[in-house]
Amino acid sequence: MNKLENPSQRDVAGPSPRHKTTQVMVGSIAVGGGAPIVVQSMTNTDTADVEGTIAQVAALSRAGSEMVRITVDRDEAAAAVPHIRDGLRKRGIATPLIGDFHYIGHKLLADHPACAEALDKYRINPGNVGFKDKRDKQFTDIVEMAIKYGKAVRIGANWGSLDQELLTHLMEENANSAAPLEARAVTREAMVQSALLSAKRAEEIGLPKNRMILSAKVSAVQDLIAVYQTLASRSDYAIHLGLTEAGMGSKGIVASSAALGILLQQGIGDTIRISLTPEPGGDRTREVQVAQELLQTMGFRTFVPLVAACPGCGRTTSTTFQELARSIQDFIRDEMPGWKTQYPGVEQLNVAVMGCIVNGPGESKHADIGISLPGTGEAPAAPVFVDGKKFRTLRGPAIAQDFKALVIDYIDQRYGSGGKTPTDATTAAAE
């Protein structure tokens, strides 16, 4: 029997089955329980600035953030929350809002019931909800508010604000062990226990499992992977993934993608945030785009049409293909908010923009619509392929504009009400 016919040799590429978790509703968004992995983000505005926060939540929502977290750190911020919610609704935006509470969340929720009602989820950090004898009461107060208003809660441990009493206890216990672990391993265990013990306490107070999401964030990739693997192995709570303090630019993107990519491949994670430090004056929505691209490139979800483009080499000294690839990608992202309703299914479109004859025609044939631009020294002609077949050859100085027009035409005919493709309608025009 040929090796390819051996059942044990069959293609097993793909992620592990999703870790089974209890589904939680955050507003209208389902998290866990087999629901699609949810993208979320966080504002960096002063929440007391109602108009500024509305504008940023709206921008994050348009970019694709399905939930947005806002800081609630003082009375002015708490008082602003219902106005932010109302302002978003006037704009037709129903994106769930998550209140991020530290230190005095119990007091803010009690003093501002309109805030408690307006939020869709409360985030509690068990490391700073209170200290010593105050901890249990203040934690209980927040959980009881969530029960009263029917809200979900994320219990989010973070090793930058880890419960020091728990950590000290585990360190002392480890020191007296016959085979003590490294301090780093004990810290990871403290992270997991902090989340799980807090969740157990919340259940004892009366908050059901289907209202709780857990997270345990660290800033080191290998530690994050280990912490979440342990957390998933010990519970079936819905899980929020994120690498804290990931950093700026490419470093933050690479670190977050490396950590979350491994966990997602193992079936762990129900909602994710890519925590990027924005460049001065940078676009906050970048973290949403990266989260979407991570999920889409791994095959978990589709958000926008993908544009494949070659990296370039000595055969492509012209920048035309690079400029066209960027132009098409930017155009698609800008148009997606309207296309989602106008062209259902358009997010599954694949476009190829290639730079020379070596791989250009082949890659273009694999895409729904693709173009192979001429490389250095090649004839000034660019064949266009539609659904795997040569459709037309573009020439002249307006190749980029002509190809964009063909992409628009393809989308309209394939995903519009007619459901046709350019090859159906205009095959006679092809060479």
UniProtKB/Swiss-Prot annotation:
Sequence positions that bind [4Fe-4S] cluster: C310, C313, C356, E363
InterPro entries: Dihydropteroate_synth-like_sf, IspG_bac, IspG_bac-typ, NO2/SO3_Rdtase_4Fe4S_sf
Protein's UniProt keywords contain Metal-binding: yes
Protein name: 4-hydroxy-3-methylbut-2-en-1-yl diphosphate synthase (flavodoxin)
Pfam families per the UniProt record, alphabetical: GcpE
GO annotation terms (biological process): isopentenyl diphosphate biosynthetic process, methylerythritol 4-phosphate pathway; terpenoid biosynthetic process
Keywords: 4Fe-4S, Iron, Iron-sulfur, Isoprene biosynthesis, Metal-binding, Oxidoreductase
Domain of life: Bacteria
Cofactor(s) needed: [4Fe-4S] cluster
Any one GO molecular function term: iron ion binding
